[in-house]
Each structure stands twice: as C-alpha cells, then as structure tokens.
A protein has these predicted regions:
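Hydrophobic helix-and-loop "lid/oligomerization" segment in the mid-to-C-terminal part
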Residues: 1-99, 104-134
Length: 134
C-alpha cells in the first residue's frame, strides 16, 4: 500500500519537476490574487514534455499564497491556447470561460483561445475581471 501510495500520489517525473520549475519562474500575479502561468511550445520542446507532464498544472499554481484564481495558458500549437481556470468561491470559473466559448464547473473550467499566447493571456484576464466586476 505504501509503495502504491507514493507511486501514484507523491512522485512526479523529472520532466514534470523541471516543468514546474520553469512555470514557477514565470508566474505572474494580477490584481493581488490572480496567479497566471504560461506554458509555451518552446518550454514543452525544451523538456521534451508530453501531455501527461502537464496534468493538473492549474491546481499546482493555485497553491500560491493569496491566490484566489489560478489561470494556466498552455500553447497547444501555434495560434491555439488551452486555458485552465481554478477559482475560489467568489468567482464562477464556468461563467468566466463561457465568455470565451468554454465551460466547466463553478470552481474549475476551461476554454480554447485562438491567437497568440499574448492574446490568450490578455483575453482570459479580461474575462476574469469582467465576471468579477459584474
């Protein structure tokens, strides 16, 4: 049981740990409680990372002290970004992502934004602020 617990819940691949390090180095905070991580194709290529190395990155960055909203912008291919959003009880993640054609649940949602990484970052931040400010 102990080895299975460790293998499934307490270990991460070296690629995953390196990716977490790269992501942490680039974290940005907006409005004092929105933490945003960006994962580019260049980052993925540099580590030869795969889809499974990216699992639950949004929850990982939500661990930042004071962060009520965690946004991950991941470039899937040139011109296409996947957004993962995790929120506290004061912001409906599904309502935010619905503004951008996505959906999900109150505390976890996602969408796809077509355009540059910079555009995706600006659009999701604008949507968070729109829903938050009512």
């Amino acid at each position: 049981y102990a080895s299975a617990n460790k293998r499934h819940f307490r270990t991460r691949s070296l690629k995953r740990l390196k990716m977490e390090s790269m992501i942490m180095a680039g974290l940005e905070i907006f409005d004092n409680d929105i933490v945003m991580a960006t994962v580019t194709l260049e980052m993925m290529k540099a580590l030869d990372a795969a889809e499974q190395d990216m699992e639950d990155i949004a929850a990982f960055i939500g661990q930042v002290e004071g962060a009520d909203t965690a946004v991950t912008v991941r470039e899937l291919r040139p011109g296409e970004c996947k957004i993962s959003l995790r929120t506290g009880r004061d912001l409906n993640a599904s309502a935010v992502c619905a503004l951008l054609g996505g959906g999900g649940h109150a505390a976890a949602a996602g969408c796809t934004i077509y355009g540059t990484v910079e555009r995706a970052r600006a659009e999701i931040l604008r949507a968070v602020r729109t829903v938050r400010n009512g």
